[in-house]
Amino acid sequence: KNTDQGSYSTQLANSILNVRTNLDIDITSSTQVKVNLSGKLKEKYSPGSISDGVLMETLYALPANAYPVRSHNGIWGGSNMYPKNPVAESSSTGYTTSHARTLLADLTLTQDLEALAPGLSAEFRIGFDAYSETWDARSKQYLYESNIAHLDNSGIPTDTVNTQYGKEEKQLGFNSWLNNQNRHSNIQFALNYQKDFSQSNLFASIRYKQDKNVYLGQYNTYMHQDIIASGHYGLLNKYYLDFSIAASGTSRL
């Protein structure tokens, strides 16, 4: 907690909210729908101008006696050789907030087509996933100083030279940006046929699939399309024949 500024905190914190539901609905005796929804909201608070990794690197690289946390003048300690004071970097440079949102949704519709032909059914699926992450940064600089003592021939301090760096800012600057974003959509349609005979069984299917991914940035949209036909025949639970044929295409926009 930043004790010098009561209006905000630089304490690391995470807030997460998850929501999920799964529905199985029988619309009619021959029509079923399945719906799956999942949502997530996440907020993360962290010190303003230094990441977790850089902070740990600074702690490992800084000698234990390089300078005090604060000088005798009450100013943050520092030096020209080691300018980053880990305590000051984590408590006096403001704070950042990240907002991440995730949505996962899919729907499956199954239709029995026994009225047209025994063993015939159709299936339709659609899915949509979305993710975005935005960052808000409220940052400022801080004043720090180095104290170098001049010693006489006996090793007794005679004078201290104080050199100040940086500047003390009272107001927080603001910056906001979209750090990451992607969307994924999927559509499938299938026509299935299944028939059991006295000594054999048959299954055949034809399926169309379209998959689209949109990432952050220009020319980062990918589209995939597939048409797949497959079949299975079993005789006496002993002899089997399978086949599959597919056509696929990919484009980048």
Segments (PLM) and residue ranges:
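Flexible loop and strand-edge segments within Gram-negative outer membrane beta-barrel domains
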Residues: 1, 10-84, 94-100, 133, ...
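Transmembrane beta-strands of outer-membrane beta-barrel pores
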Residues: 2, 39-43, 104, 111, ...
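Extracellular loop and loop/strand-boundary signature of outer-membrane beta-barrel proteins
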Residues: 4-9, 22, 90-96, 108, ...
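Residues on the lipid-exposed face of transmembrane beta-strands in outer-membrane beta-barrel proteins
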Residues: 19-25, 105-111, 189-193, 229-235
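Short loop/turn motifs that connect adjacent beta-strands in outer-membrane beta-barrel proteins
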Residues: 30, 112-122, 135-137, 196-202, ...
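Transmembrane beta-strands of outer-membrane beta-barrel proteins
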Residues: 33-35, 120-126, 202-206, 241-243
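Outer-membrane beta-barrel transmembrane domain signature of Gram-negative proteins
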Residues: 64-77, 138-252
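Short glycine/proline-rich turn/loop motifs
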Residues: 84-90, 167-172
